[in-house]
A protein has these predicted regions:
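An N-terminal hydrophobic leader/cap segment in hydrolases
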Residues: 1-29, 33-49, 140, 243-256
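Serine-hydrolase catalytic machinery in alpha/beta-hydrolase-like enzymes
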Residues: 26-28, 33-128
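Gly/Ala-rich beta-loop-alpha elbow adjacent to hydrolase catalytic centers
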Residues: 136-145
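Acidic catalytic loop of the alpha/beta-hydrolase fold
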Residues: 165-166, 188-193, 218-219
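Short alpha-helix in the alpha/beta-hydrolase fold that links the catalytic acid
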Residues: 170-172, 193-203, 225
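Short beta-strand/loop motif that positions the catalytic acidic residue
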Residues: 178-179, 184-186, 190
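Catalytic histidine neighborhood in serine/cysteine hydrolases
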Residues: 203-219
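Catalytic histidine-centered segment of alpha/beta-hydrolase-like enzymes
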Residues: 216-228
Length: 256
């Protein structure tokens, strides 16, 4: 008689790392800098990387206030979404930003020279033939997307907690002309821009979908807030994918 094998069920917590192929990558900017990052890809039954259904190209919060490629929402996206939603997740440090992965060359430029960083990230996705790239920005990262990310090669963009401090009406008009989907997640209790004002500001982008998130704050602290963000991302990038995402994983885990 062949013994039955059972897989261990793991509750997905803040430190849970689900299986994926993770590799260090370098991005090269048109002004001569090397930026450091990581690409997480879904894996097949044999553990080898496979082509994802879509790609998230992420842009982190303000580096002068602690933002970097490991900011918690993006770290959890990279730890979970390749396995749960068949998504590739590209994270990187913008110029002058450090993380355990390393330090990107250059200096913080307030969102101006970072235009080259945005272009380098989009180009890496193209070079690696990563399918259906969506830009995902958080706080300062939303400013980079609005100012520099309106590229015809992308599928759309998702903005988390956009402050709209640096992005102008002209930037929004550029997105309106591009016509690509623009999904805007705005915390009810945001420190900078709340849902009602966000709807007014983004009204000049006809395709923008502004979603107010009850009880949430700018930093999306807490597992319930993170789950809401990841569900919204997957729901827009892969509309046919079952939601909510699972809270348990059957099988092995990767080391943290």
């Amino acid at each position: 008689m062949v013994p039955m094998t059972t897989q261990t069920s793991h509750q997905i917590r803040s430190t849970t790392v689900l299986p994926a192929h993770r590799e260090d990558v370098e991005l090269h900017t048109a002004d001569g800098l090397t930026l450091v990052g990581e690409l997480a890809l879904p894996v097949g039954p044999d553990g080898a990387p496979r082509t994802p259904s879509a790609t998230l190209v992420t842009f982190h919060p303000l580096p002068t206030h602690g933002g970097f490629m490991d900011s918690h929402v993006y770290r959890k996206a990279a730890w979970r979404l390749p396995a749960l939603a068949d998504l590739a997740v590209l994270r990187f440090n913008t110029r002058g930003t450090s993380s355990p992965r390393g330090t990107s060359e250059g200096e913080f430029d307030g969102g101006e020279a970072e235009r080259y960083d945005v272009a380098a990230a989009i180009e890496l996705a193209e070079f690696r033939e990563l399918p259906r790239p969506w830009l995902v920005g958080w706080s300062f990262g939303t400013e980079l997307i609005l100012k520099h990310g309106a590229d015809p090669s992308i599928e759309g963009a998702i903005l988390l907690s956009p402050p709209l401090h640096r992005a102008t009406d002209e930037d929004l008009d550029r997105w309106a002309a591009l016509g690509k989907p623009l999904v805007v997640l705005v915390p009810e209790l945001d420190d900078y821009l709340r849902p009602e004002e966000a709807r007014r500001r983004f009204a000049r982008v006809p395709q923008a979908e502004v979603i107010g998130v009850d009880g949430a704050k700018h930093l999306w602290v807490g597992e319930s807030a993170v789950r809401r963000v990841l569900d919204e991302i997957v729901g827009h990038v892969l509309p046919d994918h079952p939601l909510p995402l699972p809270t348990h994983w059957e099988g092995s885990l990767d080391p943290a």
